[in-house]
Structures are given as C-alpha cells and as structure tokens.
Regions:
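N-terminal Sec/SRP start-transfer signal
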Residues: 1-28, 196-200, 257-276, 324-370, ...
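Conserved transmembrane alpha-helices of multi-pass membrane proteins
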Residues: 50-68, 140-168, 195-209, 233-246, ...
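Basic-flanked hydrophobic alpha-helices used for secretion and membrane insertion
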Residues: 390-624, 701
C-alpha cells in the first residue's frame, strides 16, 4: 500500500520536484562528465611520450573532493522540498499516519526523483564528456574525434556517490519530520530567518574587522619605519602614510561610537566603517602597483600581506553593504515620494525590504561564494596560461642538463663534467641527435665568485660561439661581435623598464680580460631557456670567445635536440641514471639537474589540465549552489506571495503590472548579490593580475587573457540567464490564480 502511495505522490508532485530534478540532473551531469576521463576504460591516443596515469589519478581525487560541496546543495534542495510539503505532512499526521512513516515515504519520493535525475544526468554527462575530452586532446596537441562511450566504472562511482548522498540526507530528513510538531508543520511557511539587525552576525563581523584594522595599522607603521624614504614621489608617500592614517581614522570612528553610542545609531557606525573599508581596499591594492612602477623595496611577504588586507576590507564591504541595503531602500523610499507612490512601487518596496531584513545573512554568504566562484573562473585560464607559457621556456630542448654553483666555495669544486652518461644512453637506445651543445657560463670578474647575496648574484657570460650554436638549435639568426664588444640576452620575464635601466647603466663592463663596450645591437630577447642564466638574474652577457678563454667558468650545461621525441619510459630511465651519478646536491656543493621535454610536457599538461578542470568544475558547482539558493529563497515563499498578489489583483492591479512587479523583484533579488560580487571580484582580480603582470606579459599576453576572461564571463552570463528565466517561469506559475 505504501509503495503505491509513494509512486502516486511522486507522479502527482512532479511539478513540485521540478527544481529538485533539474538541480540534481546538473550535479550528476557535471560529476560524470568531469570524472569520465579518469575511467580505467578511457584510453585516448596521446602517443608514447605521454603517461596518462598521473592525470587520471589526479582528476579522480580533485573532482571527488570538490563534489563534496554538492552534499550541501543536495541538503538545501531537500530542505526546500521538506518546507514545501509541510502542510501535506501535517494533514497526513492528523489523519493518523505516524510521522516516522511520513518521513520514510518522503525519503522514498526523493529517492525516486533522485534516481530519475541520475539516469538523465548520466545520459547528459555522456554528451558533456565530449567537451572535456576535446579540452584534453587539445592540451596534448592531438586531433579530436567524437566517440560515444559509457564507462562502467564511472557510472558505478556516480551512482554510488549520489545514492549514498540521498541516503545520508534522507536519514536527516526522516529525523526532522519525526521530531517536528504538527503545529510547526502548519506554520512552517510563515517562518523566516531572524532579522540581521537582531542577530549577532554583524557585531561579530565589526569586532573582527576592527581587530584586522589594528593589524593593518601596525603593518603600516612597520613598513614606514623600515622602508620609507623622504625622496619617494608623492603617490608613494600617500600609499605609505595612507596605510597608517586610514586605520587610525577607522579605529577612531569606532572609539567615538563607543563613547556616544546612545546618540549615534549602530547603523551610522556601519556607514563610517563601510566608507573606510572601501578607501583602505584601494590603498592596499595600490601597494603592488606602486612597488612594480617605482621598484620599491617591498618583498613578496609584504605584498601577500596586503592582499590579505584587501580581501578583509572587501569581505567587510560585502557584509556591511548587504546589512545596509534595506536601510538604503527605506531612505530612498522616504525621500522620494514621487517614486514611492508611483504605480505599485509601494508594494514592491515592501516586498524587497521585508525579504532583505530576514535573509541578509544568506545573501551575504551567497555574495562571498559568488566572488570565490568568479575568481576561480578568471584565475583558471590565467594560472594555466602562465604555466603553459612557462613550459615553452622550460622545455625548449629534448634533453637539458644544467648546474649551479650556489653552494660551491672552492674553485676546484666547480662543475666541469661533460655528462657523458647522456651520450652513452642515447647511443645504446639508438636515439639520434640533431644538435648537441656542451658549454660553460663564465664570471666576467673572478672576484664575483664569492658574491652570494640573494637577488645580487653576479651576471654570468656565454661565449659567442656557444651562443650562436644555441641560436642555431632554436632556428634563430646568428649574431656577430667585435673583439672589444659585448651584448646581452634577456629572459622573457624581464620588463622593458628593467632592461632599459640596466643598459643605460652598463654601456661598458670590466672583465678579467679587459674592458668591453656595449654593441650597437645591445640586447636580444629570443627565448633560449631559463637555465642559461645565473640564479636570481634576468640577463646574460654574450662575450667574444677570446675573452671567455681568460674568465672563470662556474656553470657547465648541455643542451640536446633529438630527431624523434624520447619516449616517456626512456626519459624516466635516463633521469634515474643521471640522478644516481649526479645527485641534486653533490658533496662538492654543486647542484645538478636534468630536464627532458617529454617529462616536462607530460607533467605540466597533466597538472595544468587537473588545475583548470578542478577550478572550472569548482566554480560551476559554487555558481550552481548560489543560483539555486537564490532561486529557492524566492520559491520557498511562493505561498505567501500568491496571497499577496491575489490581494493586489483584488485591488485592481492589471496582470501586465503584476508581471512587471515580479520581474523587478527577481531582478533586485538576483542583481544585488551578483553585482556586488562582480564589483568585489573585479578588485580582487585586478590586484591578482597586477602582482603577476610581468608573468602575464611574458607567458600569456594581455590580449589572450582578455579573450579568456571574455569567454569565462560568457559562461557566467549563460548560467545566470538560465536560472533567472527558470525562476521567473516557476514563480509566475506559483502566484497565478
């Protein structure tokens, strides 16, 4: 009998479960699509030089960890269904059915709908997995062909995860129904969150904000004490002193409110702190920009500290703005009677203000989560583009042997080996070479050998013949120098300002073989790999061969290109042999290393793909959670809204005006957290881009970055439009007579 009741209720309540089904279907689709490439049955043709195991295992771990966020979404959507059916449960209890039985019937209904969602989701996931496969094969540079395949282990893992989730949430729902009183079920629709003004949420946020402001004050004082110089330009002076004076003003305003809190309303305190947080966020965000522009002596730790300050100020801005939103609307309504009494605006203001007063905490959390989701969407292409561009610099040669003398303090212990173990292995495995260049890097002056200060390492030099050999390997034109000339080679990460400043100060250099003057062609920027430079330097001297013969060689490198790509298995074997003979830290203090383009590309592509898919998947999950919560917050109160709009109809309001009211209400409800999140995320992303602007310029390019950001924002807009339209349709049906 109960089985028939379950199926009848499920069939009758399909419309009520529509949001539940849609949300669960999206979750299952995403889970299956992203996890499909970790299947043991998935074997793309990516060539012998790649190993797919690293990517497969990493994807499985990353996706499963992020998917734990879906437990919250499943729980929230179930709570929505629980609230929606409270009256029905109350009637069943009054008719004599045990609440334990009611809970089990509800669990069975949600399980049926959940299994239906799993079936649809897996079917849709098969289609979506084609996009993931296309991304993967594009990353490996392989052609893509559509192939419709259902992976049994991925299907099993998907079913197990979601069924277990349904059971866990179902147990909690059953216990909730069992413990809920009938009178509470009947009045459930009238319950709201406590007003934010009466909760402890905002006072706690204010106290934490003031504590962090005190930290900001101490940091500003410390930076002025150790790094300030009266000769700094005016913008830098404002930055230094502003990061002291503004925290003082913030703390002073809070102290004034404490002394006169009977005369000054708590809302006025929040007003002042909101303004201070905005000003200080911009001041803190100016630190990396001014540091890069004027070469300020602020290290990475300080820049990271100010990133934390920016985040703190922006988080408080979100909390304060949402808290003040209803007050701002009330103030506008009071001061603008022409808007207040126009059409049905009085009804509209009442709807928005009452909802904001009772759901501000939820709106704040949604806004913060949206900021995180947007940042993940934007940061994913930046980080992967940075890594991919850096990979091109790191893997320019099939075999790259390099050394360092950072911990060598005796000249006889300097690296001077020719690394013949590489030659023997290549000969044994019949791997032919196209180019093979073993070369030294020299100190222009022997006295610089003991200079080991970080970021003040001496610039090393390469002979003209070795430099031309490397250029020939990479397909660049040969260069020439006069006997008393030198030129420079620069890393891609070096800025134009840094290069111009260096060349202006080094029109000539002293060497142990005499003085050299800067060539007419003073610099070259064609990338030759990062191991051709000394530690912590971005420039390399190119000197005539006869000069280098009289200099001290401190680094010995070897670059090889082969006729065919070295297989992954052979690269691993040779790497093991090399590290056994040349440990990373030798007893002499010399540092040795070897890089194979096969291994570099394999690990970088795998890590980049895992990072990109995990961040995009996580961002989509967070976005779906936020938009679902925003949607359900409106639909949960559909019963109350139906009565309110029916009263409005009886007062003579036209259906056209009611439709406009619904559109306005949903626009404010979706627009407030989303616009706030976009503004805050824009500041965070701008700060993030500013701190790594040199890397973006060198490895990605700002035009490419803008295209990636545009595509990302397009995805966000599509998600928003889908949820907004769905909510509008369901809401309109709910309030119709």
């Amino acid at each position: 009998m109960y089985a028939k009741l379950v199926f009848r209720n499920a069939k009758r309540s399909v419309k009520d479960y529509l949001v539940y089904i849609v949300t669960m279907t999206i979750c299952v689709t995403l889970f299956y699509a992203f996890l499909s490439i970790s299947s043991s049955y998935y074997s793309p043709d990516i060539g012998s030089e790649y190993d797919f195991t690293l990517l497969s295992d990493g994807m499985k771990i990353a996706i499963c960890m992020i998917t734990l966020l879906l437990l919250f979404l499943i729980r929230f959507v179930n709570h929505y269904m629980l609230r929606r059916k409270q009256k029905e449960f109350a009637v069943q209890s009054i008719m004599g059915m045990e609440q334990k039985t009611i809970g089990r019937i509800f669990f069975a209904e949600t399980l049926i709908m959940g299994m239906f969602s799993i079936l649809i989701g897996i079917f849709c996931g098969v289609f979506c997995s084609q996009f993931i496969t296309a991304m993967l094969l594009t990353a490996y540079g392989e052609p893509y062909e559509i192939s419709w395949t259902l992976f049994p282990d991925t299907v099993l893992l998907t079913v197990i995860f979601f069924v277990v989730s349904f059971f866990v949430v179902g147990v909690f729902n059953t216990r909730t129904i069992k413990k809920t009183k009938i009178i509470d079920m009947l009045s459930a629709e009238k319950e709201n969150e406590p007003e934010l003004k009466k909760s402890r949420f905002i006072p706690v946020v204010v106290i934490l904000f003031l504590m962090f402001t005190l930290w900001e004050l101490f940091s500003g004082i410390q930076n002025v004490r150790f790094y300030y110089d009266s000769r700094f330009v005016f913008p830098v002076k404002i930055m230094y002193w502003g990061n002291i004076l503004l925290p003082v003003v913030t703390l002073g305003w809070a102290a004034l409110w404490m002394l006169k809190k009977k005369k000054i309303a708590f809302q006025k305190l929040i007003d002042g702190l909101l303004i201070c947080s905005v000003l200080h966020a911009f001041l803190a965000a100016s630190v990396p920009a001014l540091t890069n522009q004027y070469y300020l002596p602020l290290h990475g730790g300080i820049l990271n500290q100010y990133l934390v300050f920016v985040l703190i100020d922006l988080l408080f801005f979100i909390c304060a703005l949402i808290y003040l939103a209803s007050s701002l609307i009330v103030a506008w309504k009071v001061k603008s009677p022409e808007h207040r009494y126009k059409g049905e605006n009085l009804f509209f203001f009442g709807q928005i203000i009452s909802k904001l007063n009772t759901t501000s905490k939820t709106m704040t959390l949604i806004c913060i989560t949206l900021v995180l989701a947007i940042f993940m969407f934007i940061a994913a292409p930046i980080l992967t583009g940075w890594s991919s561009g850096y990979l091109d610099i790191r893997s320019m040669y099939d075999v790259q042997v390099y050394s360092r003398y950072n911990d060598v303090y005796e000249e006889e212990n300097l690296p001077q080996d020719s690394y013949e173990i590489i030659t023997d292995f290549l000969t044994e495995h019949k791997i032919d070479t196209v180019y093979d260049c073993t070369f030294n890097l020299y100190l222009s002056e022997k006295d610089d050998f003991h200079n080991r200060q970080k970021y003040d390492f001496p610039i090393v030099a390469i002979s003209l013949s070795d430099y031309n050999t490397i250029r020939e390997m990479l397909g660049y034109e040969q260069i020439s120098l006069e006997e008393d000339e030198f030129t420079t080679q620069w890393k891609a990460i070096a800025t134009e300002e840094e290069r111009d400043s260096f060349l202006k100060e080094h029109t000539s250099i002293m060497t142990d073989a005499g003085e050299l003057t800067l060539s007419g062609q003073s610099y070259y920027e064609d990338p030759i790999g990062e191991t051709a430079y000394n530690s912590y330097t971005n420039v390399l001297y190119v000197l005539p061969d006869n000069i280098c013969e009289k200099l001290l060689p401190v680094i010995k490198n070897r670059y090889i290109t082969t006729t065919e790509n070295i297989s992954y298995e052979n690269a691993r074997k040779l790497e093991k042999l090399f590290t056994e003979k040349y440990p990373e830290q030798a007893e002499t203090g010399a540092i040795y290393g070897v890089r194979f383009s096969t291994l570099q590309i394999n690990s970088s592509i795998a890590n980049n793909f895992i990072l990109q898919t995990a961040m995009i998947y996580g961002a989509v999950v967070l976005m779906v959670i936020c938009l679902t919560v925003l949607s359900l917050q409106q639909l949960l109160d559909a019963g109350q809204y139906k009565y309110r709009f029916s009263v409005l109809r009886k007062l003579g309001a036209e259906e056209k005006h009611i439709g406009k009211l619904i559109l306005q209400q949903l626009s404010v409800w979706f627009g407030l957290p989303i616009i706030t999140a976009i503004i805050v995320a824009a500041v965070v992303i701008a700060y993030f881009i500013q701190t790594i602007s040199a890397e973006i310029s060198a490895y990605i390019g700002f035009s490419t970055l803008m295209l990636q950001i545009g595509a990302t924002m397009g995805i966000l807009v599509i998600l928003l439009i889908c949820y907004f339209i769905s909510t509008w349709i369901i809401f309109r049906r709910s309030v119709n007579p």
